[in-house]
Each structure stands twice: as structure tokens, then as C-alpha cells.
């Protein structure tokens, strides 16, 4: 009698392996989605904190006697210290100097923009049109930063008093 040589996998074994791979893929997609969502939120919070430190440091330079502040990538000053208490001057300069900050949520808003820092009125609500966006606004006495961390969450707000 001749012996049968069975090499390979049966159809049932292959179906079980495919089912296991499908389950692992489904779990992985959900976990990855949560990971990227948390990373975006963390980046938006980091942008807010960095903008705050940057503006506070630049305004402090003015208080210590410098004449110019908030230089852009080319080294051009975006703010003359004598104008720092003029409404919107700090906000305009900060938005221009920090134009390399990118929105972790990509292009949002109308018109769509991938920038993260804007000279604009304070955010009051956080929705899909302003996720990841940090608005800078200043009066003659106060600089206000507002950031939408994630749609549906509270707006992160902080005000600085001019020195």
C-alpha cells in the first residue's frame, strides 16, 4: 500500500488563521485611532503652552529694554516694543512670528488653514472648524490666548497682563 503524503494546511486551518488576523486588525485599528486622537490633543496643548511662554518671554524682553521682539524665521522683528500695548499689535506679531506652528488636526476652518496660531478674537466654543487652533488677542492691557484642544471639549483660555 502506498503512503499518502499530505503537505500543507487544510481549508479549515487557513480560515481560522484569516479570522484571527481579521480580529487582530480590527483591534489594532481602534487602538491606533485612540492613539492618534490623544497625540493630536497633546500637540494642541503643547502649542498653547509654547505660544504662552513665547509671548511672555518676548514681552519681558521689551520690559528689560529691548526695542524689537518676536522675530520671524528670517530674523525680522514683528513687534516694536513701543507698540506692545497697542491693541492687536502683539497678536499680529505673534501670529506672524509663529507661522511655522502647524495645526495637529491638519487644515481646518473657513478658509481652510493648516496653521496653528492666529490673530483673532477669543474662541468661545470648540468645534470641528477650529480644532487645534490657538487664537491670540490683545487689548492695551491684556493678552488672551484661547485654544480648541478637541471638538466638543472646553476651550483652553489664559490671559496675561501687559508689563
Provide a role label for each language-model segment.
Residues 85:
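Basic, alpha-helical nucleic-acid-binding regions used in initiation and control of genome expression
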Residues 21-25, 90-95:
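Alpha-helical interaction segments
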Residues 1-49:
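Amphipathic alpha-helical segments typified by the pilin-like N-terminal helix
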Residues 161-163:
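Conserved small/polar residues in nucleotide/adenosyl-binding loops
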Residues 53-78:
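Alpha-helix exit/C-cap motif
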Residues 5, 72, 149-150:
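Acidic surface patches and DE-rich sequence motifs
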Residues 91-158:
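Low-complexity, acidic interaction segments enriched in glycine
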Amino acid at each position: 500500500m502506498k503512503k499518502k503524503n499530505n503537505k500543507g494546511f487544510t481549508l479549515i486551518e487557513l480560515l481560522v488563521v484569516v479570522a484571527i488576523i481579521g480580529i487582530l486588525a480590527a483591534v489594532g485599528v481602534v487602538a491606533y485611532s485612540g492613539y492618534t486622537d490623544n497625540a493630536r490633543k497633546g500637540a494642541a496643548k503643547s502649542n498653547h503652552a509654547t505660544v504662552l511662554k513665547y509671548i511672555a518671554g518676548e514681552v519681558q524682553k521689551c520690559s528689560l529694554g529691548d526695542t524689537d521682539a518676536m522675530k520671524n524665521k528670517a530674523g525680522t522683528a514683528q513687534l516694536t516694543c513701543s507698540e506692545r500695548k497697542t491693541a492687536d499689535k502683539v497678536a499680529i506679531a505673534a501670529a506672524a512670528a509663529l507661522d511655522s506652528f502647524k495645526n495637529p488636526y491638519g487644515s481646518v476652518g473657513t478658509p481652510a488653514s493648516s496653521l496653528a496660531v492666529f490673530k483673532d478674537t477669543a474662541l468661545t466654543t470648540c468645534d470641528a472648524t477650529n480644532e487645534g487652533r490657538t487664537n491670540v488677542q490683545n487689548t492695551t492691557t491684556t493678552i488672551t490666548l484661547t485654544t480648541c484642544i478637541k471638538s466638543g471639549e472646553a476651550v483652553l483660555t489664559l490671559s496675561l497682563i501687559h508689563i
